[in-house]
């Protein structure tokens, strides 16, 4: 039996008998605003595990990049290749292989979520996003908008490419290769999602550098937790119907929790506890994770 090495917001990482292999165990927990909600979503972990595995296999089949997936060994578990994690900024050796890149890469295709809120505050400009100054929520960007955030700080923070290079100590060519992979992966996701009437709005991804420092896609992506999705038919009618964890965020924005939490963090106070979800929202969320697995993969859940 292995031992638990790490307890994340939505999954556990366990050791195995092979020192180079780890086991991901996905839980039914759900988190928003870097807080774990004290409500469980039935079969959510299974949905995340199976959805990510679907994307990993497609990406390998199309030769986009390597991945760390070894095999799916249970409905809510998978085996992955271990990568070394070095949290100290700038400390990763330039010749190290199978090492985690301590950054998150966000790719946006439509104006929504936190990008919309930053756009309204003037923190993101029309020129940066490739949209008109008077554009509305949900506007399609003229080209994908890439952002980099920190990984090992208390809260994720948007950073420049220059700071990303300092924190990770990877080369500019390696960062550009990561960006290139993100765009290719998102093109694949967009193509597959469109088959079942879905729009891929945005998403985040994490990487390692594997053999010969080649880019390796790791962790989870292309799910309702890391990515945002809309219904394509509704979008054509001018409506952005959230088919992702965003509607859970919207619930807490509506209750005022998000504003209270932001105020506490801005003043350096302790986070206020996040309340449980109403049963109706739990049921709707469980149904969403099940139905979206089927729409994303064209497989039965």
Language-model features and meaning:
Residues 17-20, 209-213:
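Short acidic-glycine loop/turn motifs at beta-strand connectors
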Residues 106, 200-204, 217:
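A structural signal for short, well-ordered beta-strand segments and their strand-loop junctions
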Residues 170-201:
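A long amphipathic alpha-helix within ATP-dependent nucleotide-binding catalytic cores
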Residues 121-177, 214, 221-301:
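Anionic ligand-binding catalytic core segments
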Residues 116, 212-217:
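Short acidic, Gly/Pro-enriched loop/turn segments at secondary-structure junctions
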Residues 28, 109-111, 207-211, 221-222:
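Short, flexible loop/turn elements at secondary-structure junctions
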Residues 2-149, 268-301:
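Active-site loop/lid in soluble adenylation, ligation, and acyl-transfer enzymes
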Residues 70-71, 193-210:
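A short glycine-rich, hydrophobically flanked beta-strand micro-motif that places a catalytic Asp/Glu
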């Amino acid at each position: 039996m292995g031992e638990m090495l790490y307890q994340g917001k939505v999954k556990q990482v366990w050791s195995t008998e092979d020192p180079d292999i780890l086991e991901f165990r996905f839980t039914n927990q759900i988190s928003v605003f870097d807080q774990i909600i004290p409500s469980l979503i039935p079969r959510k972990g299974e949905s995340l595990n199976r959805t990510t595995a679907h994307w990993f296999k497609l990406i390998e089949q199309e030769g986009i990049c390597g991945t760390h997936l070894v095999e799916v060994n249970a409905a809510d578990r998978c085996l992955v290749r271990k990568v070394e994690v070095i949290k100290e900024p700038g400390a990763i050796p330039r010749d190290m292989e199978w090492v985690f890149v301590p950054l998150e890469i966000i790719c946006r295709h439509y104006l929504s979520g936190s990008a919309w809120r930053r756009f309204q505050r003037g923190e993101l400009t029309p020129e940066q996003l490739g949209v008109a100054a008077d554009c509305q929520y949900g506007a399609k960007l003229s080209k994908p908008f890439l952002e980099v955030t920190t990984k090992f700080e208390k809260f994720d923070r948007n950073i420049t490419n220059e700071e990303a290079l300092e924190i990770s100590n990877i080369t500019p060519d390696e960062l550009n290769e990561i960006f290139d992979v993100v765009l290719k992966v998102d093109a694949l996701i967009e193509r597959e999602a469109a088959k079942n009437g879905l729009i891929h709005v945005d998403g985040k991804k994490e990487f390692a550098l594997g053999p010969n420092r080649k880019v390796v896609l790791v962790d989870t992506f292309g799910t309702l937790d890391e990515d945002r999705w809309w219904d394509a038919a509704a979008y054509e009618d001018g409506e952005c119907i959230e088919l992702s964890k965003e509607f859970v965020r919207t619930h807490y924005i509506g209750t005022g929790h998000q504003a209270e939490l932001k105020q506490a963090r801005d003043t350096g106070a302790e986070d206020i506890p996040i309340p449980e979800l109403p049963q109706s929202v739990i049921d709707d969320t469980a149904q969403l994770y099940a139905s979206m697995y089927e729409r994303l993969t064209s497989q039965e859940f």
